């Protein structure tokens, strides 16, 4: 029979390792002698691997691809047969891991095929993209159907893994993930061909489109997190061709030139009511900016305000002043902490006046500032902001009695109003006068610091003052730090960093004027490129300086839960990133390099055997190397003590060396590891707890070290508290845990991440009706009621944006948005007169900044998309925010309008309002009505305003100066990053490039296969063990190195 002769032929070719060119010539001869159908030939090829007894033979996909390009077998036939014989159908028993299934599989009866499947599918993708195969409409239809079957099979396998107690599902199998990605790319490539577009666009192929839509609907949710670029491409494909897996009778949507006509007609029919700027709108927005890490970006704020108020600058000024006083008043009523009160107060007194002054500095932009302030002050709550004379007759809290005066003097200091107006605006004689020297100027402060470095310490102590000078101080200190980084003046830089680290509230105020990225990027670059051989003299001062700078970076990172982009770090090779992600994990001795083993031994000897830490010990080990060894040092030392090889007093005495100022920052890493060790260990925790007690509450510590030690405890206290409470629950009779918890208690309020307190969460979640979402709706209603009388000087309703943030983080943005839409619908139906106010409040909540996505907002605002390189990637954010949820709902409006017309209309109106508020900045030419009897046409460039604020609007962390750090590794690092970034190209271009590479030479001369777990070659060379390889990396590999497709396999499998 022909099949027997072909089977023997294929087996001999595999046995003798016949290359592609010779296989093509031999197979052409055999076709003349023994003709065979493409399905039978494909089956024969796939069954031939059973005879080899190995899981992966790289020649088999080469032979299949060769036959496809010869036209002897068709792609849809190959995909169908491949799926039929694939081990993706295997169902592991509950509790069995994927590796064991592969290991125990019997090759001749049940061969593991995923690596072969991956390579064949990738070859198919490349041949389709090059136009070599799948040329007819019928082939395209059959290929689409085969791809849909593959997707459904992979999803079914993933679900079976979950059902078999494999919580990782597909994530537990690198090969399955790569197969999942390959099938998705194949679908994307086919859909991008001319014939593919014809099939997806034509009405007669509706059954095929339904089949593809059902597969896509199952594929996209899993793809979203694993392969975002591929998800975006397929998601666009689904929307473009309406591939939702339903027949047109259910969708009832008219498509014309790929435009949803019904959707456009419906949106056009939705009429907007008058735009209302509720008093609650800015109240919500400012609360959201300041509730956790200060999310203040001048460009974003100014753009939001202009979008909200357009040319009405007098209204803008009055409303933001009123809202800032309202936020401060609300904080007092809610008994917010003193540090929160200081931040709100500083925003009003230190931030707003220079912000207004910068606006006025733009030519021809004028507004009656004194009148705006007067109107605003007439609307604030007099019980919270009493006059000086009223303060003595008040029985309540008069802590904010001087805020009005502070604000007015700050405005006068910035030349917004004359000093003589203060008495009239206050309604009484002020209790102070303007300082003789006027407001601080940033450049003058920089000059003072350069002349006398001790001046920096004095200025830092003034950051928390409320005299209107904080912005100039922050600008000067930040730029001086940048200059010191460039000059490598680390001694002075150390003193500034120490001063800032021990003043966490000053850091809050700094973020009103500079982003974390702007402050920290030069510091992180300095630490990452710190060369040990550059430093001369004693090593202890270098450790001291390095540790102080690092401690400030860690203080920012842990206080505000910053991510790498916020720190200004782009490379995964960064020491800072490695320390944060890996520093608290200890290593086994056999995992250490020879250098690390030597350093570890010398540090153990210095701490526990010698009489102190010698110069030789430190000079042999750079600070970066030491910090990465701390966890292992603790693991080995504590293990020796627990094994009885080291006395506890010796252990304690050795660790006390780490309480010296030059080593103290390393306790951040040490305490983190120690807390994890205590929490994870099932052994008796006595020795680890005694060690922790000695480090948290040392019996003696120097005055200089005490401040650093407090900063270390601030950083680590929250995680230690959670771990110790869990250990106490497991060991309720232990009495040695409470003293540690008591020592940590004063530090627990260090973090500022907008997380709610337990005392807040309980009433929200127990709210009747509706729990947390019900409590949000109740708050929403109180905001509407308050906004119905915007000119009355009444107390604002109790509000904290923590409520919304908590709901987003726990319930998800989609459910929160649904609750807001429910309330909007209720207000529209029950009280149409407040519908406009309700819409503005909802839009303000949706538009409000969120820390998780704020970096993305900054990137979008400051990034020049017209001139940017494709390599510049927007930072990812790990949460689905309200804007994302609203966009998703807006896409469903056509279908929703058939079921719930009013809700669909509300979504359209809310979507329009949010887009108006968040519209990107542009050159604007507003018509300014100054209530002065004339209209003035002004070309107001927002960039000019930002420049007048003396703030950097670039968003990349560099001030208005060249931040060339003059460090040896900069050029190399930039080259590496550029090489990496150049791989991030447009998906369409990648496909074209990959096709061009394939067209060069597909003759393959492969080495022997093996029984390894890696994944083949070609575009299938996804990297041995590289699970998260992106589409761009995979395909660009072929583009940059066509020989990548022809690599010899020898040595790749072990």
Swiss-Prot record:
Keywords: Activator, Nucleus, Transcription, Transcription regulation. Its main location: nucleus. One of its GO terms (cellular component) is mediator complex. The keyword Methyltransferase does not apply. InterPro entries: Mediator_Med5_fun. It holds the Pfam family Med5. It is found in: Nucleus. One of its GO terms (biological process) is regulation of transcription by RNA polymerase II. The keyword Chaperone does not apply. GO terms for molecular function: transcription coregulator activity. Component of the Mediator complex. Belongs to the Mediator complex subunit 5 family. Component of the Mediator complex, a coactivator involved in the regulated transcription of nearly all RNA polymerase II-dependent genes. Mediator functions as a bridge to convey information from gene-specific regulatory proteins to the basal RNA polymerase II transcription machinery. Mediator is recruited to promoters by direct interactions with regulatory proteins and serves as a scaffold for the assembly of a functional preinitiation complex with RNA polymerase II and the general transcription factors. This is Mediator of RNA polymerase II transcription subunit 5. It comes from Emericella nidulans (strain FGSC A4 / ATCC 38163 / CBS 112.46 / NRRL 194 / M139) (Aspergillus nidulans). The lineage of its organism: Eukaryota, Fungi, Dikarya, Ascomycota, Pezizomycotina. The gene is nut1.
